Amino acid sequence: RISLMAGCYARGIDWNDYIRQISTLPQLQKADIMAACQHYFGNHYLLFHKKFGKYKKDKISKPPYAPVQTDNQNRQSDYAVQLAKTATPTLTPQFIALGKEVTTRHLGPQADLYTTANPQNDIFRLTLSWHQIQAEKPIHTMSDLFDYLGTSTLSKQAFAKQLQALGTTLSGNYALGGMSIQLSGFDNNLAPSIRLLTDLLQHPKTDKKFVATMKKDARLGDKFFGKDMEAIHEAVLDKIAMGDKAFELQNMPTSELKRLQVADIEGLFKAAQTGKLTVSYSGNIAADSLANLLKPVTEDENRQDYKGYDYEVKRPEKPTIYLYDKADARQAIVGTYTVLPPLDTEEKEALFTIWRNYFSNGSLNSVLFRELRDLRSLVYTCGGRAYTQWFKAKKNRPIGYFTTAGTQTDKALTTLSLIDSLLTDMPIDAHDLQNAQQSAMNNINNSRPTFRNQPGYMAEAVLEGYTEDPNKARATAINQTTNAQVIAYYQQHIQHAPRSYFIIGNLKAIDRKALERYGKVVVEFKKDDIHR
């Protein structure tokens, strides 16, 4: 709502006029929509074709600029000082409670239901999530299956037509951590919608067209992976932190995917239903009535427990330099990698969260952004990324922390040197530390899920080992954390911690001799090391 208000203000639209405009939406009829489509979607259109390639680089001289004066970087204008004196209410965080906002029911072995009431209308949303690790499966391409799936008695078109007659939509997702299917429609058509879903789950049918499409998408994915700098960046970080457990390495090899037939795909769809099941629902059907409707889906008792993705961050024995060559890259991505102690209490998690906000993840207010971009114009982007454990039982494992920065290739080593020095000698500003703490609290306040997302939120929390909203304990810990504690955490665990380094870009333009100051061990990744 705030975003809509801001958009109206920016375009000079009166908010009341906007409200009056959207209030006419319920009066629209199907004929109105059809008439608009027939009027605008005619034979007069532009057709765009996309062609991959690269332009010849222009050689331009660096424009002159005046250095930024840094002696008053924390000075505030009179307006900002006056604004800070304005009284503002203190927000009390709102948390989700099982038994209050969210009702639960046990559906059977490894199957649970989470529901919440819909106070606004009679539209439901039902999500079934089967949780299991699906390594060595075609996880990058299976999600498209839901556009080609029918049953043994209903073709895809016939199945979709029956859903449409009920006013119900179906979508699905197939990923490394499991499979999910979401239904949305009218509460009075929930029962027939679930019957159709049951038929789909028990008697899935697809065709050769999907298999051909899936194989084509896999080939294109392999072809274009090396062209996407951000995809390479993520895959390299995963490989450094997770080794052979890196997400990109869990997909089915293309050579094996080529041999898949229709029966194999249907078998994978059925096998995905053997994971731990959580069902999330928002609507006006009572939990007990819904549990009864779901019996045909939950009667199979061969589901397995789920303990999350099992990995431990890799700790290099010596400071290591990780390299990935992208010969046609105009820019480079550089950064550091550090293994930090476990975040096995809310207090430790609060310390790391506040420090990370302050140093790398506080957007315009972070140390990295100010030092690398504001004051020196060295980078295009910068930030931090943490590899933490989500399941409570695994919180006793160390975490991995990266700094990252995108810069010009000829500035790569300068940028890396500056990041390294900032980690060793971090500038400390009490006001910015307070802002980092407030940002952590703002994230909790702003992340409270809407009613439709509350069942899924609590289902995930319970799955990860929590008995209540995990943000409740986090908020308490963040509020009780002091600047002195954050500084001590940095000095004890980060300031002198062993670091490794990475560079992604055109390695021919990198001075290998100068790199030796960061470490003697060099690991140079190839495409097959980070992508399958």
Predicted regions and their residues:
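Proteolytic maturation boundary segments
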Residues: 8, 16-132, 136, 266, ...
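A common structural junction motif
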Residues: 199-208, 296-304, 376, 421-428, ...
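Alpha-helical scaffold elements lining the catalytic groove of polysaccharide deacetylases
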Residues: 257-260, 265
